[in-house]
């Protein structure tokens, strides 16, 4: 979905103004900048931003990648209102204090017609993973816990169902365009089995693509990817 948005924007030649909230060392930002877009990376970690600066400099992208230190809720203070064509918020909503407040901040910096790429941890995947690990009590806890956690030792702060994350997005004033599952079955397949099967990895990738937007498989994904637009 994200590649399609960037490719569509690239046809005009001007490129996009992109904000990568929680972008860290630039795993998404640097390739996006290399594609001709302008990227502002917001992250609370000075070490990650220093690594981003080095990575950008090595590729001659200093003019396209701009680093800001702060949290997601700082976004409206650090980035002008209605200035972003695209905001990436990947694996961030799980750890913020208030997901609704965080998405409201994103809405403020998006231009009308601008898009949000949101990636969050899926609740159902945690339930299934704990059950397959022989931990039915933890699976039951993840199923009923308001935050989708399987117990005190769970390192995740919260997980989402497709319905919950879509409700948050629409509550922030955005319109959901697409919802896809990421790693629907990939985390359940032993890599040794794929290595032993000729073409196994390619076949798994094709299966992932086929399952990613189909219910009920999408709901089982390790992560949920939501693409939304500001009306």
Across the structure, where does each feature detected by a protein language model lie?
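A short glycine-rich, Lys/Arg-flanked "PGG" loop and its adjoining helix->strand segment in the class I
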Residues: 100-115
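A conserved beta-strand element that flanks and buttresses the S-adenosyl-L-methionine
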Residues: 88
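Class I SAM-dependent methyltransferase SAM/SAH-binding core
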Residues: 27, 31-74
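Conserved alpha-helix/loop element of class I SAM-dependent methyltransferases that forms part
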Residues: 1-14
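Short alpha-helix
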Residues: 156-173, 179
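Conserved Class I S-adenosyl-L-methionine
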Residues: 178-231
